[in-house]
Amino acid sequence: MLIQAVTIFPEMFDSITRYGVTGRANRQGIWQFEAVNPRKFADNRLGYIDDRPFGGGPGMIMMAPPLHAAIEHAKAQSSQAAKVIYLSPQGKPLTHQKAVELAELPHLILLCGRYEGIDERLLQSSVDEEISIGDFVVSGGELPAMMLMDAVLRLVPGVLGDMQSAEQDSFSSGILDCPHYTKPLEFQGMAVPEVLRSGNHGLIAEWRLEQSLRRTLERRPDLLEKRSLIPKESRILNKILQEQREIQS
């Protein structure tokens, strides 16, 4: 997989290309990265790529021509079709399912905005999709781009040492993950649940599923509304709801 970022701050991506599982996978050649600086495509000696907005208003707007040239340069680096994504609070929310879809693609180009935004004509002519990482504003698209990259890359075969880790993460099954424990057996008066030390894999799997459903019901009930539960999950969830009704009565 080739991922390119159109950014005026290429060095920011060192954290994902050099460190952790994504850095290791990059060194192993499982995925490749290139930062494309649109300043190199500016039509002025000083490398300006922004200007004041028509109609007035605060801040500066990134200009379409240098960004378009940077995107076209990025596309030319691969013979495979590229999907151009603009990281924007106006985009559709990034979900696990979207990350799964993007992990199947051979070439992604991530457009990282700065200042007050990007000329709308560039978005209409050169961007395939806008994606948001949440309903809040950050200073630029670089951090959202790296969050998207991490979410996508961990789903690419070979990036994680054990793909089961990705399969069991929160959201991969549509519900939140269960609690996890390791040594010591007791910490500040809190002991590891007995069932996890029982060696009974059936009971452990049942406990973990129940804890996942409890946590999802408490913290993200909206996820349960979107999910079609299998009979085993419905049975456990009904048990949890019955317990809650008894406590409230």
UniProtKB/Swiss-Prot annotation:
Keywords: Cytoplasm, Methyltransferase, S-adenosyl-L-methionine, Transferase, tRNA processing
Catalytic activity: guanosine(37) in tRNA + S-adenosyl-L-methionine = N(1)-methylguanosine(37) in tRNA + S-adenosyl-L-homocysteine + H(+)
InterPro entries on file: Alpha/beta_knot_MTases, tRNA_m1G_MeTrfase_C_sf, tRNA_m1G_MeTrfase_TrmD, tRNA_m1G_MTases_N, tRNA_MeTrfase_TRMD/TRM10
Residues noted as binding S-adenosyl-L-methionine in the record, renumbered to the chain: 113, 133-138
GO biological processes: tRNA N1-guanine methylation
UniProt main location, coarse: cytoplasm
Alphabetical list of NCBIfam families matching this protein: PRK00026.1, trmD
Subunit-structure text: Homodimer.
Protein name: tRNA (guanine-N(1)-)-methyltransferase
Source organism of this protein record: Neisseria meningitidis serogroup C / serotype 2a (strain ATCC 700532 / DSM 15464 / FAM18)
UniProt gene name: trmD
